[in-house]
UniProtKB/Swiss-Prot annotation:
This is GTPase Der. One of its GO terms (biological process) is ribosome biogenesis. Associates with the 50S ribosomal subunit. NCBIfam families: GTPase_EngA, small_GTP. Keywords: GTP-binding, Nucleotide-binding, Repeat, Ribosome biogenesis. Pfam families: KH_dom-like, MMR_HSR1. Residues 4-174, 183-358 form the EngA-type G domain. It comes from the Bacteria. The lineage of its organism: Bacteria, Bacillati, Chloroflexota, Chloroflexia, Chloroflexales. GTP 2 binds at residues 189-196, 236-240, 301-304.
Amino acid sequence: MPKPIVAIVGRPNVGKSTFFNRLIGERRAIVEDIPGTTRDRLYGDTFWNGREFTVVDTAGLLFGDEDPSLPEVEIARRTRVQAEHAIAEADAIIFMVDGRDGLTTADADVADILRTTAKPVVLAVNKCDSQERMLDAVEFYALNLGDPIPMSAFHGLGTGDVLDRLTEYFPPKTFEKDEERHLRVAIVGRPNVGKSSLLNRLLGKERSVVSPIPGTTRDPIDTTITYYGEPITLIDTAGIRRAGKIERGIEKYSVLRTLRAIERCDVAMLLVDATEGVTAQDTHIAGMVIEAKKGLILVVNKWDAITKDSQTYYEFEHRVREAFKFVDYAPIVFISALTGQRVSHLLDYAREIYAQRQKRIPTSELNNFLREVVVQQPPMAVKKGAHLRLYYAVQPQTEPPVFLFFANDSELVHWSYARYLENRLRERYGFQGTPIVIVFRSRERKEER
C-alpha cells in the first residue's frame, strides 16, 4: 500500500520548516550521504501510530527559501499556490498558522481554498508555548476547518496531537493477496527524455499525450499489460525539471509525482537523454530510487540521434557508468523509443530484477558463504586494539534483500567491510538491478558464551 503524502502549507515564518525538521530529522540524518540527495531535504518519511507517511515542505519545494520580507501581496500569492498544489497532489494537508500573530487575512484566504477540497485538513496553531497562547488558539475556529490544535514545533508541545488527528484520516492498512502481486514498473526521468514515447512503444499504441513541450504528461498513468503470460503494470510520470523561476514552481512540484510512482513500483526505468548526456537531475532521481530501495534500470534513450563510430557505445557507456557509479549494480540499456530499438529488452530486464529482489538465500548456505569470505578477508575493527568477530548471518527480508550479520560489537564494523560483503554477495548470488541492505547487530553477551 503506497505511503500517504502529507503537505504542510502556511504563510512564511509560521514554523513549517521547524515542524518538518522535527518530523524527519532522524530520517534526514540517515540518508543525507546518499548520492543524488541533499542535506536540505524537501520531503522525507516519518512514522506515527504505526503508520508511515511522506511529509513535504511545500513552500520550500515550490519557492526555495522563504523570505518574510516579501510584499504582503506576494506572500499571500505564494501561500495560495502552496494550498492549490497541496490540494492537487497530497493525500492530506497540515495547515499551519501562527498563534502569536493571530488570525490574518492571508490565513482566511487560504482557508477558503482548503475548504473546497474533500481531502483532510488538520489546522495546526503553532507557537502556542504557554497556557495563554493555547487558549488563544480558539480564535482560529473562525476558519471553519475543524478544531484548531495548539502546538509548539520548537518545543514539541502538541505535535503528537496534530499527528494523532492526521493519522485518523489515513485509510486502514490493506494487504494485497499473493495472487494480486505482480511486477510494477515506473518510467521516470526529466521532462522530454521520452518517457511517454517509451510507454506508447511498450503498449503499442498512443496512451499518453506526447509533445516536445516538457511536462505534457501530467499525472501518473497506470496501464497493465500481459508479457509472456504475466501481468506488468507500467506507471508513467510527469518528469522532473531543473529549478527555475517561481512561475515554474509547478514543475518542481512534479517531484511528488515521481516520489509517488517510485514508492509504488518494484523497478524504476530511469531515462537519460543521449543527446544531452547525464545531468545532475538524472543522478538526483537515481538517488530517490536508491532511498526507496527499488530496482533500477538505466535507460539511455534517443540513441538513434547520436552519430556513432566503433567506439561511441563503449565511451558513452563508460561516461554513464561513471556518473552513476553509486548504482553500479544497475544495468544500462541503450534504446530508441522512437524506432523501438532494444525496447523489448527492458521488460526482460525488469522481470529479472523483480526475481532478484525476491531471491532468498538459505541460512545454512549464507553462513557457509560468510565463513568463506571472512577467511579470505578477515574484518578489521575501526578501533585500535579491538577485535571484531562476525558470528553468523540471516536473511530476514526480501524486496529488497536484507542481510543481518551478528557481531561481537556492531560499532566496530568499518563501512568498507560492509561494502566488501555486498560485493561478494553480488558476485556469488547476482542481485542485478536491486539494492541489497547490509545490517550489523551486536550479539548479546550471554549468547557469546
